[in-house]
């Protein structure tokens, strides 16, 4: 009988739509040998070899004696050089589709056929998604929990048992170098419990150091006993016990002869795994009068000696991870510290196969998170998670129970084929009964938008580039520095901080985007992926210094290293964690839901006298005297608020000063304040002003990310200076200051489990996405959002997420309640003519200059007369416009490049305009010659390729202080002179998206204090609605200068 086949192609509405063939494959009988179109192949590197990557082009289900799946695959980017992968036995159940990337283990036959069956080979689905052994082991009993734990990482709270386990791991690992005698173990335990390393965790869990020490000491005799029984150290020449084996020879004995590594961090793109091996040991195995040495992973467990499938599975997975660094150990060791009993866990094929299948299933659900509707609308919805298990008892103690029920009720129950085990229906109902349909819809929409955004970022960059691209390729993008050798001594800063210095094997350190404070992954150039992670301390021409979590001193001296920027995933876990918290059944979350989702009106008290303490009135009155009228109104509104206030900080209105003054007043009234923003620099700008007024504050965050003048107030520096090692001292520090400052993503700090604030102030609130902005609001009774939704919105890269509303900030959302809004309209930055531009375009005339001095201010050019005299001698008819542009009394100039002409060019790196770049360069040279300081000039362009081109011109000029940057980088800042290059100039009607955003234009127009020069092609820019209005206003004011043909070539030198 002929086998029956069922074809599977990439669905026309799938996520890979743009990468699939323009028309479907025909039936296999008609076109079985045709070369599939390469449009199905995603933009990822494909290759053969040990770390092969194949793209699945076509899937055929074959029903013969046994069901099989035949995958047509290629390792060619062109879609040729086809191979066949046959899935047999239970591998047939693998969920896979055309366009998926796979890795194959096994042997390929001479006819280019792979066979993956019960007995041969492995298939790794999405191998570049590295999944931890813990997640896979937890997925054995409930795959849904593993998926949710990956998504809602910040919701997995620590526990006393987990902390004890971590500390015991630490003690054991230290003992591998110090010894396992009773006295040494006691000393290590004391050092661990009473040292600074775990103080935060003990504070968070409200533990007592003496109690913790007592619990830790219960384990110490077992550690000593294990060393006596199983180590071959000269101090432990006792009888060797047999390890218990989960399978194998009962006469086998095992003894540890050497500890090679602790917490060995391994990434395995070969098996799609990652993990930290507790201990890597050289082991001597005696079997039937024979002895042999092996390097094996040793997994430590502090809980009940269960020898459970989850525990054994982790060890089996570590045997696979170990193959990234050395030969297959074929087995691993599982040690229970409570009893001192150790098991040998063989890494047999059966266990490895089943665990990799679970890993594939987990990777499928973590990758295929979105679903395109089949109704022709191409609407994106959230995909279902693995099914719920029918075990109420297990679910009762699950840390993801709330998220499990929440996702089911808000997402899965909206689909037709949603199934819930009958016994779980009341559980889901109980966990979510406090939520209304509006609440569930808010959660569903924001979960979808955050997922769309995370996926759009992952498609452009990601961790996989570290192993899929060479260091030279990554260097071109500024994301890596390769060919490095380690130099000098490794300095130990703390238990998990080691200062390393690297230099280029030949030549100086290349130009790079890597900067101080950036997170990096250190790998070997040819082997040893992800040896260590850490942060850059300093980048110089001759060397680069890093603080890493591991010492690299034991590695070969001639090993070449590469440092890769570890790009964040966009903070998806923070977004989802805050969304989950908002849905909690708690009074804090309920209040925020009412204000944010239900739009309950904010409440205010009527009289300040009920708020201001009598002894603070004179101080507050003194502070208020230095403010203008709108700023005073803002102070009053905040003090009267019971829920929230929005302060609209229009350009140049002294937003930072206003926040600083607000903190001073709240401080004087005895209120506690949580001060936050999205960026460290925004937080520190406020603190630098506060510092001058002797307002005490505690700054949370990694020291390397903080402004140098703020670092002395950081938790890290204070703990070092005071040598804080007790919980009482730490608690005193955390409660010592009424003002605590951190970023919005720093609120997972332990201090927030014990402290609540009277007010939370969020700066840059109009630029922060709603879920991130939510984070600090959970920890205060009232909040103040400061921003301006007429300036830059939250950055959203996904067009679909933007259309759904992800660029709406919490500031913008709450602005509908106008009684909570105060506008700062008096500005101190721009002269009147520059201010008039945004006043007409955006602010409807509400902006006003603070004084005549501000209104009439012009750029200071001490050498302008000398320069103008020089120009008169060299002047030609073609360059007369230059004098007008230099004239300080002309604050606004638009240089129309239409007649030159100055057409844009589009290359691989992006869009640029070399003529505009040249004009910007020459204009800047003239301003410098006229006496303008380089630091007073700023250059703005919407496209990075244009910035790169302009910067290349400036490399030949000693004017490195002239800042060249995007609009986004200039938000909140100003310069005396701003030159804007609009770049776009074409005849085919191309527009692009960057210049369509009037908020971005508003920021560009409001950065200049005294002189604003814009360059662009009027006919092209007129096609943008917002720019058309600008050009119309400029024409009315006679501020447009038509540059003559070849103007860029007639510059006076």
UniProtKB/Swiss-Prot annotation:
Annotated EC: 3.1.-.-, 3.6.4.12
Cleavable signal peptide: none
Cofactor: [4Fe-4S] cluster
InterPro entries attached to this UniProt entry: Dna2/JHS1_DEXXQ-box, DNA2/NAM7-like, DNA2/NAM7-like_C, DNA2/NAM7_AAA_11, DNA2_Rift, DNA_replication_fac_Dna2_N, P-loop_NTPase, PDDEXK-like_dom_sf
Residues binding ATP: 649-656
GO BP terms in the entry: base-excision repair; DNA double-strand break processing; DNA replication; DNA replication checkpoint signaling; DNA replication, Okazaki fragment processing; DNA replication, removal of RNA primer; double-strand break repair via single-strand annealing; mitochondrial DNA replication
Primary subcellular site in the record, as a coarse category: nucleus
One Pfam family hit: AAA_11
Annotated catalysed reactions: ATP + H2O = ADP + phosphate + H(+)
Localization (cell): Nucleus; Mitochondrion
DNA-binding recorded as keyword: yes
Cellular component terms per the entry's GO annotation: cytoplasm; mitochondrion; nucleus
Role according to the record: Key enzyme involved in DNA replication and DNA repair in nucleus and mitochondrion. Involved in Okazaki fragments processing by cleaving long flaps that escape fen1: flaps that are longer than 27 nucleotides are coated by replication protein A complex (RPA), leading to recruit dna2 which cleaves the flap until it is too short to bind RPA and becomes a substrate for FEN1. Also involved in 5'-end resection of DNA during double-strand break (DSB) repair by mediating the cleavage of 5'-ssDNA, while the 3'-ssDNA cleavage is prevented by the presence of RPA.
Protein name stated in the entry: DNA replication ATP-dependent helicase/nuclease DNA2
